Curated annotation (Swiss-Prot):
Belongs to the beta sliding clamp family. Its main location: cytoplasm. Forms a ring-shaped head-to-tail homodimer around DNA which binds and tethers DNA polymerases and other proteins to the DNA. The DNA replisome complex has a single clamp-loading complex (3 tau and 1 each of delta, delta', psi and chi subunits) which binds 3 Pol III cores (1 core on the leading strand and 2 on the lagging strand) each with a beta sliding clamp dimer. Additional proteins in the replisome are other copies of gamma, psi and chi, Ssb, DNA helicase and RNA primase. Keywords: Cytoplasm, DNA replication, DNA-binding, DNA-directed DNA polymerase, Nucleotidyltransferase, Transferase. The gene is dnaN. This is Beta sliding clamp. GO terms for biological process: DNA strand elongation involved in DNA replication. Pfam families: DNA_pol3_beta, DNA_pol3_beta_2, DNA_pol3_beta_3. It comes from the Bacteria. One of its GO terms (cellular component) is cytoplasm. The keyword Calcium does not apply.
């Protein structure tokens, strides 16, 4: 294999694929990236066995071929080469090293056979829809903070992407929950989305797909099967296994009849929560909300650090009550509100609270209260 490629094209493609490679691997080949040179393209592939990212770039191919090389080392070398450099990559069977040359720089990297590199099959990915990139970014950004990190409840370790039909309108919906809070975002379903299987996309896959969307075009092609999901971003593509499990019936926990409705300045409220939470205990981070007409009083008590109290003006004219929440969960939800105001819908201190964004009715958040 022998080729020349511009540093910018090489760095972009390597940046897309190398992040899927774990820093520590018990299987040596998984630390490597597969380089395939053919025609006028150099293609790149990286995998952790659950997910695969591929990309390609134009190159001058003198001798076609395939080889694998250490992903992170190769990326760091190319990243540190000067802008505008032409990079030469070469490998021959006589010397088990990938030779990298640019200007007066020369590097030799150990390689492993391309035939040992695992390739993820894309069989069964029959459902394909084109999703507006900005809308897909919105679905992910509005929900992924609520994905669970507890491995014991593995079926919550991802984003549940599916279609629903409400009032005769089909919507593409994303839901995440960790049992303490729930985030839901939806958009009108793209053409062809009706009937696609609902899948739980793993947390790491969501993070990688979101990163690739930064340089995607106007649409992302999404292919779904009950076992896999594939995102296509032009030349780059991400294929991943989905979580084999049943996502809980989340509609049962979304309040429908919470009658105590409160509207507040989202930014002022978030800053107040952040201030009083400074002295909260790290484990619970609980904050008490004393709600009464016209105001909320936020209180945090910590036996060791003291007490914090702050009042915030609100639009509320119902009966007074007190309720507690995890401060971090409150801040996470406030951080997703697009408009200047947030609307909280309460039932009682022991029941879930619904938070909605008046300027984006396609998102909903549910917070479970704490005992304070």
């Amino acid at each position: 294999m022998k080729l020349t490629i511009e540093r910018a094209a090489l760095l972009k493609a390597l940046g897309h694929v190398q992040s899927v490679v774990e820093r520590r691997n018990t299987i040596p080949i998984l630390s490597n990236i597969l380089l395939s040179a053919e025609g006028d393209r150099l293609s790149f592939s990286a995998t952790d066995l659950d997910m695969e990212i591929i990309d390609e770039g134009f190159a001058q191919i003198d001798v076609p071929g395939q080889i694998t090389a250490p992903a992170h080392t190769l990326y760091e070398i190319v990243r540190k080469l000067p802008d505008g450099a032409d990079v030469s990559l070469s490998f021959s069977g006589d010397d088990p090293r990938l030779v990298i040359q640019a200007g007066r720089s020369r590097f030799n990297l150990p390689v492993l056979p391309a035939g040992d590199f695992p390739v993820m099959s894309s069989d069964g990915l029959s459902s394909r829809i084109a999703v507006d990139t900005n809308e897909l970014i919105r679905l992910i950004d509005k929900t992924r903070f609520a994905i669970s990190t507890e491995e014991t409840r593995y079926y919550l370790n991802g984003l549940y992407v599916h279609t629903v039909n409400e009032g005769g309108e089909t919507k593409l919906r994303a839901v995440a929950t960790d049992g303490h809070r729930l985030a839901l975002a939806e958009m009108p379903a793209p053409e062809g989305a009706v009937g696609i299987p609902g899948v739980i996309v793993p947390r790491k896959t969501i993070a990688e797909a979101r990163r690739l969307m930064e340089s995607a075009g106007e649409t992302v092609d999404l292919q779904v099967s009950p076992q896999k999901v594939r995102f296509e971003f032009g030349a780059a593509a991400l294929t991943s296994k989905v979580i084999d499990g049943a996502f809980p019936d989340y509609m049962r926990v979304i309040p429908r009849d919470n009658a105590k409705i409160l509207t507040l300045d989202n930014d002022l409220f978030a800053k107040a929560v952040d201030r009083v939470a400074t002295i909260s205990a790290e484990k619970s981070r609980s904050v008490k909300l004393a709600v009464e007409p016209g105001r909320i009083t936020l209180t945090v008590r910590n036996m060791e650090a003291g007490q914090a109290v702050e009042e915030v003006e609100v639009d509320y004219d119902g009966e007074p009550f007190e309720i507690g929440f995890n401060a971090r969960y409150l801040l996470d939800v406030c951080g997703q509100i697009a408009g200047p105001q947030a609307e909280f819908r309460f039932a009682d201190p022991a029941s879930p609270t619904l938070v909605v964004d008046p300027v984006d009715p396609g998102v909903k958040y549910v917070l479970m209260p704490l005992r304070v």
